Amino acid sequence: MKNYHDIVLALAGVCQSAKLVHQLATESRADSDTFLTALNSLFITQPQRIEDVFGGEVRHLKLGLETLIHQLNAQGDQNLTRYWLSLLALEGKLSKNSDAKQTLGNRISRLKEQEIHYARDSETMLSIMANIYSDIISPLGKKIHILGSPDYLRQELVQNKIRAVLLAGIRSAVLWKQMGGTKWQILFFRRKLLATAKQIYSSIY
């Protein structure tokens, strides 16, 4: 039997990354706690439970759950829809490419080693994360076209933050697949996903 609770949390992680990308592209900034939750997820590679990936508590996925609920209600921004569905598509490409998976694992391991020297949200670490996305994930499929303010999108730091968040979105998409998530559920079990998302969201204080 599918564990829809865990599937929804992972999918909320994907949607949270999509929302952060939108914020960065249109405002050049994102909610700092939510942004850190996304970055931190890249460093939790052996969680005991799915909540551990997102700071140990579902409240850290509040923005993602809100976004997912709007999306499942067909009330969401079309760009957000494109972002999170593109992340799921890229995860599908990644799962079929053993070389890319191995390289990604190696690069994430090296990323974790850099924690000794740099804060996770430092410009150096953001650049490393962005390069991992550009080198490994981006070539796997159709590039995600980000819409926003040209002035912001030209800034290297904003570009790096967006790519780092997209990498975190891939992390959540991998987790979604591991939890038993499928695209068929989004098509045929939307009500179940929506009800579960609302139930989890209502538990956040």
From Swiss-Prot:
Similarity comment: Belongs to the HflD family.
InterPro entries assigned: HflD, HflD-like_sf
Superkingdom field: Bacteria
Any one Pfam family match given in the protein's UniProt record, by short name: DUF489
Name used for this protein in its record: High frequency lysogenization protein HflD homolog
Xref: SUPFAM superfamilies: YcfC-like
Keywords assigned by UniProt, alphabetized: Cell inner membrane, Cell membrane, Cytoplasm, Membrane
Mode of membrane association: Peripheral membrane protein
Gene Ontology cellular-component annotations: cytoplasm; plasma membrane
Organism whose genome encodes this protein: Haemophilus influenzae (strain 86-028NP)
Protein localization: Cytoplasm; Cell inner membrane
Keyword Signal appears in the UniProt entry: no
NCBIfam families the UniProt entry points to: PRK00218.1-2, PRK00218.1-4
